[in-house]
Amino acid sequence: MRLMAEGLSARRGEDLIFNDISFALAAGEALVVTGPNGAGKSTLLRVLAGLLEPEGGRVRLEDGPSGFEHPRELSHYLGHRNAMKRELTVEENLTFWQRFLGDSPGGSGIGLVEAAEAVGLADIIHLPFGYLSAGQQRRMAMAKLIVAFRPIWLLDEPTAALDLSADRLFAGLVAAHLDRGGIVVAATHQPLGFAGAKSLEMTGFVH
């Protein structure tokens, strides 16, 4: 399977944010997207996730599972917000996402306790999400990536609020996903430690 971006452009209001962005990622490959604030990193991820229509160009899958035409159907999107209900427990939040997303063809997610263990927080899944620190909340949002299988991970500043040990833990999750043949696109201001990752620097436009 290959994730293809072909001549993508996008606008914010009347302003063109980026133009003619193209890349191809095969199974087991990662792309790290860098650039200053306002360069369009988050917008690019939203276009890839199918949350925003591009001004031009297209996103497509090549040699993907039968019946799946757009990457959004096979993607996890982790944005700046963690997409968890503060009043629900961690376990309830992860259960919702596991059931809502289900598994894509070619793999299966792991159990809730196992996922919480993978992010180092198995002993607090009974707590309301809102009780957790910012770093713990981000770790639990990462657990959402592994309770339901999606071959494509689209990650916006994934290590925000994480300490050094959690950074390493996250890098391990990504490495395991790539080893399974997954694809990762991550926008960041910080080094992510993805061995062998491709890179895309976005500069934006001066208006």
From Swiss-Prot:
Amino-acid positions noted as binding ATP in the UniProt annotation, renumbered to this chain: 35-42
Gene Ontology MF, one: ATP binding
Record-annotated ABC transporter domain positions: 3-206
Keyword terms: ATP-binding, Cell inner membrane, Cell membrane, Cytochrome c-type biogenesis, Membrane, Nucleotide-binding, Translocase, Transport
Localization terms from the record: Cell inner membrane
One GO term (biological process): cytochrome complex assembly
Annotated Gene Ontology cellular component terms: plasma membrane
One Pfam entry name: ABC_tran
Reaction(s) the record says it catalyses: heme b(in) + ATP + H2O = heme b(out) + ADP + phosphate + H(+)
Entries under PANTHER family matching the protein: ABC TRANSPORTER I FAMILY MEMBER 1
Subunit structure: The complex is composed of two ATP-binding proteins (CcmA) and two transmembrane proteins (CcmB).
The family this protein is said to belong to: Belongs to the ABC transporter superfamily. CcmA exporter (TC 3.A.1.107) family.
Protein name: Cytochrome c biogenesis ATP-binding export protein CcmA
Organism: Rhizobium meliloti (strain 1021)
